[in-house]
């Protein structure tokens, strides 16, 4: 299971240092023949729609609604994808002798996001290989800005 903290703070991962770690990870996976850890997790984006509304988009090409499960428990959002290898999606089955290059992940995956107690999951949609989950960040009345009218006498 891959665990991510869902925060409304921007996350800066595209730094020179993080790129170096990714390159080192790829180098060791090439030498050892083992799969890169980050390759078993589908890519995702977190976008702000309005002041208190957000959406999480997870790239899940080839997964059907029946292959995906979304749940919340305590302060976690859990997304599980299970894809049967023998599943025929109207494509002609071919025998593959050797995979020369593979970037499209097609196996099982699990993503977990820690949710702030004020974040509520509103809905989820699956459209053209993109799983979109909508969130609302609820601000308590006491913390909202209250404008006080000034009366002139």
From Swiss-Prot:
SUPFAM superfamilies to which the protein is assigned, alphabetical: HSP20-like chaperones
Cited Pfam families: HSP20
Keyword Iron-sulfur: no
InterPro entries, per the entry: A-crystallin/Hsp20_dom, ACD_IbpA/B, HSP20-like_chaperone
Keyword Lipoprotein: no
All residue ranges annotated as the sHSP domain in the record: 35-153
Keywords per UniProt: Plasmid, Stress response
PROSITE patterns listed in its UniProt record: SHSP
Family, similarity comment: Belongs to the small heat shock protein (HSP20) family.
Designated name of the protein: Small heat shock protein ibp
Gene: ibp
């Amino acid at each position: 299971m891959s665990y991510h903290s869902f925060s409304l703070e921007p996350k800066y991962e595209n730094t020179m240092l993080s790129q170096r770690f990714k390159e080192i990870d790829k180098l060791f996976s090439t030498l050892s023949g083992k799969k890169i850890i980050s390759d078993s997790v589908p890519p995702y984006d977190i976008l702000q729609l309005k002041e208190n509304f957000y959406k999480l988009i997870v790239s899940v090409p080839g997964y059907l609604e029946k292959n995906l499960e979304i749940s919340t428990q305590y302060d976690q959002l859990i997304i599980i994808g299970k894809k049967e290898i023998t599943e025929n999606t109207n494509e002609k089955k071919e025998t593959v002798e050797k995979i020369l290059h593979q970037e499209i992940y097609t196996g099982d995956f699990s993503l977990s996001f820690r949710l702030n107690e004020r974040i509520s999951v509103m809905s989820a949609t699956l459209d053209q290989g993109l799983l979109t989950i909508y969130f609302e960040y609820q601000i308590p009345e006491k913390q909202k800005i209250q404008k006080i009218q000034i009366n002139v006498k």
